[in-house]
């Protein structure tokens, strides 16, 4: 409910640029101020790249890296506040897991995550350093998610990756647009 104080706040961060890092810090400070006493978890790329910095932000309790993000509930099992946040991260070279995701953007558009990480180390991008090397789920699981999106009335499917599986999911005739 609007106006109520949260017991738990989860901040999923970005870290493409220094400005993104600054906005993440501002969002964390704002949440801590708006919800005093709440258990604060910070995850995402900024948390993966700079866990020590994030853990030192006043009010942060737990910092979860890319590999730990999908285990959020496990880390919420012990909601004890500490003077300084605890950081749980995995070196990006050791990140192996892939957490599938198919989210609804609006009434008929779905976004299908088919890849995480990246093997292209572009000079301007932090994704390989924050999310690790490229990895994906099975084609069968992605096709199943696309089928579920179509069954739920999806008319458009946008894949989120740097490679393409469009040919595998295009067999769902009820999808008008797949990109």
Where do the PLM segments sit?
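Conserved radical SAM core fold
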Residues: 162-171
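Proteins enriched for Cys/Gly/acidic motifs involved in redox and nucleic-acid/cofactor modification
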Residues: 1-160
């Amino acid at each position: 409910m609007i106006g109520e104080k949260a017991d738990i706040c989860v901040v999923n961060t970005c870290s493409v640029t220094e400005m993104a890092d600054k906005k993440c810090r501002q969002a964390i400070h704002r949440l801590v101020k708006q919800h005093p006493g709440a258990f604060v978890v910070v995850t995402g790329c900024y948390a993966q790249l700079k866990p020590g910095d994030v853990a030192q932000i006043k009010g942060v309790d737990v910092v979860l890296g890319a590999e730990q993000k999908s285990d959020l509930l496990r880390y919420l099992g012990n909601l004890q506040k500490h003077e300084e946040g605890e950081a749980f991260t995995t070196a990006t070279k050791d990140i192996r897991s892939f957490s599938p995701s198919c989210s609804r953007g609006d009434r008929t558009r779905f976004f299908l995550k088919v890849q995480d990480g990246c093997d292209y180390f572009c000079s301007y991008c932090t994704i390989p350093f924050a999310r690790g090397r490229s990895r994906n789920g099975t084609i069968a699981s992605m096709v199943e998610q696309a089928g579920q999106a179509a069954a739920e009335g999806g008319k458009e499917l946008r894949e989120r990756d740097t490679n393409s599986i469009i040919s595998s999911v295009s067999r769902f005739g009820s999808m008008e647009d797949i990109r």
